[in-house]
């Protein structure tokens, strides 16, 4: 039996990444959306949606990244999204990196805070994301990332 609505897994770490992800919510109209973030209190902003909380980790903590990657893997396994959308950082990269394993397409929207160059996660995500976006026109390139406007 085919799904009635597409399933979206929206992923962002804390702070500005989460704020930017919240600005993309109108694009998910009509979809079944689940969220992944690093702070449980963000659940108040997405009532009626499933919220998964993963540990926050940086590139400086390999063990922390491994634990977070395992958490993201299990979330993808349970949610089985059609699409993964993220504004970064580490949890979003992990989700984009693994999305294809589950047959999901992935979209990376690099944070508007990265005005001079793409974030490290954003540069890495370009290899795996079906849609790879920057919010700064001067950072766009012919092979990606592409510019389609800003969310803030």
Please name every model-derived segment:
Residues 1-38, 42:
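N-terminal subdomain of nucleotide-sugar transferases
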Residues 12, 30-71, 138, 148-151:
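Conserved nucleotide-sugar phosphate-binding/catalytic loop shared by glycosyltransferases and other
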Residues 104-152:
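Active-site-proximal region of nucleotide-activated glycan assembly enzymes
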Residues 19-22, 45, 94-97, 118-119, ...:
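Short glycine-/acidic-enriched loop or helix-start segments at secondary-structure transitions
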Residues 7, 32-35, 50, 105, ...:
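Residues at the starts of beta-strands that form the adenosine-phosphate
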Residues 14, 89, 110-113:
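Histidine-centered beta-alpha loop that forms part of the nucleotide-sugar donor binding/catalytic region
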Residues 73-83, 91-107, 123-127:
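Glycosyltransferases and closely related glycan-assembly transferases
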């Amino acid at each position: 039996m085919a799904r009635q609505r597409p399933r979206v897994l929206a992923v962002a770490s804390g702070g500005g990444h989460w704020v930017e992800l919240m600005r993309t919510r109108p694009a998910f109209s009509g979809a079944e959306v689940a969220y992944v973030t690093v702070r449980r209190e963000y659940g108040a902003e997405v009532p009626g949606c499933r919220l998964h909380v993963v540990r926050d980790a940086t590139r400086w903590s390999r063990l922390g990244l491994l634990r977070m990657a395992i958490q993201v893997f299990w979330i993808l396994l349970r949610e089985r999204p059609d699409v993964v959308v993220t504004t970064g950082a580490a949890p979003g990269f992990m989700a984009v990196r693994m999305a294809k394993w589950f047959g999901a397409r992935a979209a990376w929207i690099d944070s508007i805070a990265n005005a001079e160059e793409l974030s490290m996660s954003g540069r890495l995500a370009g290899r795996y994301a079906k849609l790879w976006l920057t919010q700064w026109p001067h950072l766009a390139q012919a092979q990606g990332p592409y510019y389609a406007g800003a969310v803030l």
